[in-house]
UniProtKB/Swiss-Prot annotation:
Part of the tripartite efflux system PvdRT-OpmQ required for the secretion into the extracellular milieu of the siderophore pyoverdine (PVD), which is involved in iron acquisition. This subunit binds PVD and drives its secretion by hydrolyzing ATP. The system is responsible for export of newly synthesized PVD after the final steps of biosynthesis have taken place in the periplasm. Its EC number is 7.6.2.-. Part of the tripartite efflux system PvdRT-OpmQ, which is composed of an inner membrane component with both ATPase and permease domains, PvdT, a periplasmic membrane fusion protein, PvdR, and an outer membrane component, OpmQ. Its main location: membrane. This is Pyoverdine export ATP-binding/permease protein PvdT. Belongs to the ABC transporter superfamily. Macrolide exporter (TC 3.A.1.122) family. The gene is pvdT.
Amino acid sequence: MENATHPVPLIELRDIRKRYGGNGTPEVEVLKGVSLSIHAGEFVAIVGASGSGKSTLMNILGCLDRPSSGSYHFAGHDVAELDSDEQAWLRREAFGFVFQGYHLIPSASAQENVEMPAIYAGIPASERHTRARALLERLGLAERTANRPHQLSGGQQQRVSIARALMNGGHIILADEPTGALDSHSGAEVMALLDELASQGHVVILITHDRDVAARAKRIIEVRDGEIVSDSANDERPAQPSAGVERHLQADDLSQRLAEGSSEPSGAWRAELLEAVRAAWRVMWINRFRTALTLLGIIIGVASVVVMLAVGEGSKRQVMAQMGAFGSNIIYLSGYSPNPRAPMGIVSSDDVAAIATLPQVKKVMPVNGGELVVRYGNIDYHAYVGGNNTDFPEILNWPVAEGSYFTERDEDAATTVAVIGYKVRKKLFGSANPIGRYILIENVPFQVIGVLAEKGSSSGDKDADNRIAIPYSAASIRLFGTRNPEYVIIAAADAQRVHQAERAIDQLMLRLHRGQRDYELTNNAAMIQAEAKTQNTLSLMLGSIAAISLLVGGIGVMNIMLMTVRERTREIGIRMATGARQGDILRQFLTEAAMLSVVGGLAGIALALCIGGVLLLGQVAVAFSLSAIVGAFSCALVTGLVFGFMPARKAAQLDPVAALASQ
């Protein structure tokens, strides 16, 4: 039915058809060539029995669904040419939905439900709050703003739904069976509200099967079996179109408003982010147990990575410090077999004497030693016994903590005296004073004259404190039966020129051994570098193993998000109906995945620090690094976002009509 006063319809449908099925399933045509026009200010009732196609028609009118064929023009613009974001703009700015089932988000308060369209419109929070409270007060719900839907009666929930429809103006109210789930009194109140809105100039399109309800409209369109069978004015309710609303929705300015509105509204991202964070927190709190189980995977993953790397770094620093304590100018010389069938090379006393003459060398100390049984009283203990000269404390930077070191006189006389390591002292003497006591080394009595300062492990699990130093001459004569050293420790004259000293020793040894390289030279700096590389590899391996648990935590995030999308499908439909774009829904659920990851990551870091404290109490070397903590947290966040993307994308691609119809 055309209105001569308004030649350009606000809504115009021409030969609209809607089919379902196909692709191997039976095809059903729900709408069969529907054509109608609706002008600004009209109060229209679309009436029909269940299954007549009236709800499908409403979904197409409200841009929740697209027709299979035909044309739909809104204010002179072809809706088929609008993309999904532009149609979302129409739902947000032009339409307001009032559903039979209310379609309120259960976890949000009445005010938060009303504010939702304004959030996606980018309206500032203070203005949103004021407008939402004013609407609720206008509809008699001033005392119910903080109530959740389950705390409201059916009539109150429907009034919240109407307030939400009006939040962004609600120029066109689409009411689908608004009284269907209400008692007669509440239904009458809702219809009175719709009458009032129509009198104020809003376009009201009422979908109902009840002819008494339809009689409240100024125009009644009857739909039967997907076709319009009648379209007539209700003479008892004459039309009173509102010029104000029509001016607001003129076709001439719609293109500009669509171009402005379909892009990101100013300030919308902040409002949406805060809403996403609040929604995520509500969902996490409501499903506390399930959330805790999901967070547990992330917490364990982050804590594992941080602790493993901290233990690896602590071990590395400890070993490096202990190796460095022996001096970076140290060079080691020992015999070597150039091939499996050749005899082991021998470093002789003459070699030692020749090396001592080199200008690049500061000190030379031959060592003749091995792992031997040491006895004190009834205690037998295995320790490394090394025959050294008097330069031992200076070369290895290893002072004597108790007593004294042996002298040149002891060396010349092959005196059986011993300076024991810190660990040997603890094992054999405990807290007793060892100075002056005698120990048996391979049944040879040696008098303890000193105790070396504690040094710790030099590399791997070798404990440098598990040793005994005796005069080189005594070791050669009394214990090992040879004057040739097991190996030689050489201190370079300049710590910055260790490699030059090593080359000079190499050239000398080649001459002395007639070109035969039956010896091996290593320096402490190279050993430190090699050990550092080994420790880095170990740390990487530990971190990789721990990262697997972080990956498992990410899979947990994906599982919980898929479950969340399935459980909140109707909420997604509600958000789309109130103007959320696909990008808004995507950000909503990505934010929730990020929230899970952030909370889990922070809790994992806290747990890691607690574990580190316990390990430190147990004398385990632990060194937390900011880069490891930030890296683990970042990995948790990225993992959560990566694994949360698929569920978020699935949510964003849901069909609004199917989402609203889900249980």
